[in-house]
Regions:
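Conserved thiamine diphosphate
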Residues: 1-30, 42, 54-55
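Short acidic, glycine/serine/threonine-rich loops at helix termini
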Residues: 10-11, 35-42, 142-143, 192-195
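Thiamine diphosphate
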Residues: 105-205
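Conformationally flexible catalytic loops at phosphate/diphosphate-handling active centers
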Residues: 24-120
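Alpha-helical scaffold segments in soluble metabolic enzymes
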Residues: 5-16, 102, 106, 142, ...
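Short basic, glycine-rich beta-strand/loop surfaces that mediate nucleic-acid
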Residues: 13, 40-42, 179-180, 200
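Catalytic cores of large soluble enzymes that bind and process phosphate-bearing ligands
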Residues: 1-8, 88-99, 132-135, 162, ...
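Solvent-exposed alpha-helices and their adjacent loops that cap or buttress functional pockets
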Residues: 16-20, 34, 40, 121-124, ...
Length: 205
């Protein structure tokens, strides 16, 4: 997203990580967004404090490595036991989208925004959409406005949470009128995988 969205959504990653007990990578377009000079509305720390669950912070600190109460991590396991432990954490990842939505809703209430796991922009009756994330979204919105003003019916789905991927929320965000993604729709034989804006003559995706 843009610089303002980075500011607004960074607390979501931290707060959801604390409550969900799952590590997050809070990422954005490194050069495009980090080197852009824009005026933004900066968060007040008191607003952040209101949203922060201090019990969750205390619980997080209790699990930190400490010589006063040592415990072992990263011990060796055979494949069968490791697989069971790996699957045991699935419930945390399954619950995580709801936790992220909870904090997005709190931010929406404070800022008057409308952040969701997937935000739709464009024609309500679009027949083609792009699904994208990052700084491309602002550019895509301008293109969508232009195309729709000239008789097209197109839209954009902005991805806010990439992993774990909430497929059912993506489906909810796409208008029912959509029947294909991007201009591949117009071809007799559509590609199932392709990179937007790049003619891939190396891997031919």
């Amino acid at each position: 997203g843009n610089v303002q969205e980075v500011m607004d959504l960074s607390p979501v990653a931290h707060l959801a990580a604390l409550e969900g007990k799952v590590p997050f990578i809070n990422f954005f377009d490194g050069f495009r967004t980090s080197h852009e000079i824009q005026k933004i509305a900066v968060w007040d720390y008191e607003d952040l404090k209101d949203m922060c669950d201090m019990d969750a912070v205390a619980e997080f600190r209790r699990h930190a490595l400490n010589p006063e109460h040592p415990h072992m991590r990263g011990s060796h396991e055979n494949g069968d036991i490791f697989f069971q432990h790996r699957e045991a954490c699935n419930s945390y990842y399954t619950a995580l989208p709801a936790v992220v939505e909870k904090y997005m809703d709190k931010i929406n209430a404070k800022l008057g925004t409308d952040y969701k796991l997937f935000n739709y922009y464009g024609a309500a009756d679009a027949d083609r959409v792009i699904v994208a994330m990052g700084s491309i979204c602002d550019v895509a919105e301008e293109v969508i406005d232009y195309l729709n003003a000239h008789g097209e019916k197109v839209g954009l789905v902005k991805v806010r949470l990439f992993r774990p991927f909430a497929a059912e929320k993506l489906i909810e965000a796409i208008p029912a009128s959509v029947f294909a993604v991007y201009n591949e729709l117009k071809k007799d034989e559509m590609k199932r995988q392709f990179t937007i804006g790049i003619v891939d003559d190396v891997t031919n995706l």
